[in-house]
Amino acid sequence: RVYQFRHFGNGLEYAVWAFFCQDILPRRKKILSDPPSSMKIYTDIADINQHFAGACVTIGNFDGVHCGHQQLFAKVVEKARRCGGTGIAITFDPHPLQVLLPEGIKLISTCEQKIELIAMAGIDVLVIIPFTTAFAATTAESFVADLLVGTLSVQELVVGYDYAFGKGRSGNIAFLRRQGEIFNFPLTVVDACFIDGELVSSTRIRQLVREGRMDAARRLLGRNYQIRGTVQVGRQRGGPVIGYPTANLKFNPEDLVPKHGVYVTQVICEGQCYGGILNIGYNPTFGEEELVAETHIFDFHKDIYGKPIKVNLIKFLRGEQKFSGPQALAAQIGRDVLLAKQILADQSLQATLSCSEPHAG
């Protein structure tokens, strides 16, 4: 299938990456000042039947689309713009490790989030390859000759310092250099990305999220860690019983679950941003066994059951606790709300930037 991704935002979300990643992406502000209006998306290689002029290509899983990935995309966009060419990214869905490992892998971003973030980076064409055990048997030689050269007519390839692909991960940097000489395309290898002396990697970000260290995760992601989903009907006790109504989300098996407890949040609903607090856990006060994410949205009174929301996790407040009853729980939530509002007030500029969302004009 071929999709067209259109962006109608006012540009503030592009400033977020420039704001957080300016030390590692010195040209980022210039690139992001004129974001593309659309990105073409292919989910079937057979649908690619056009020639891409000056194809500058990168390949990766790009889970989280963190600052290291953004550095990679910036290089692709820079090279493509310089020659009037096309910036192309190739990625995979599901994540290869979800197919190849029995235990799978927990993902920082959904495929939907990944598409949005790659489009925001300025990429012109995104190829999403369905990853299967059959595709895993594809040799590196075949991948280069058939897809990169045969289908995309690659003119330049940009990869990360540790990238490898193909059966047995034989398509490493040395292999790609040899293939570039054979097929006459230059290879650019982007160095590892460090922020405050720490290597930026999806593995590290997953660890930080599991530990509830959202400030540290935000530095490496270049934005707040976000969960999203459709609001579910819960136990209906948040408003009537406790006095704090909640919008409830459920986790999928492949989702990365943050440390259980209470977080300060920003909630994006129907194009508007609100402050809030989020509890992730099992509701021990009421003896429940289902893992849920319950968000109380400040100064919000709409019925949003069945509607999508996005929740940015700003700061971990406290671990999940079992209280003596609803009154004790309500008293603690009241204290959580006061503290959360103060934290959001102290971060007002950052909150404004982080909550800027694409919207239909």
Regions picked out by a protein language model, each given a short descriptive name:
Residues 234-361:
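Phosphate/ribose-recognition catalytic cores of enzymes acting on nucleotide-derived substrates
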Residues 66, 118, 157, 217, ...:
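Residue-level signal for inorganic ion chemistry
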Residues 49-111:
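N-terminal catalytic cores of NTP/NDP-binding nucleotidyl/phosphoryl-transfer enzymes
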Residues 105-115, 138-144:
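Glycine-rich, highly charged phosphate/nucleotide-binding loops
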Residues 137-244, 320, 324-328, 341, ...:
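Classical nucleotidyltransferase
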Residues 2, 13-15, 21-25, 30-32:
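Short terminal hydrophobic/aromatic SLiMs and anchors at protein ends
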Residues 34-55:
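Positively charged, low-complexity intrinsically disordered leader regions
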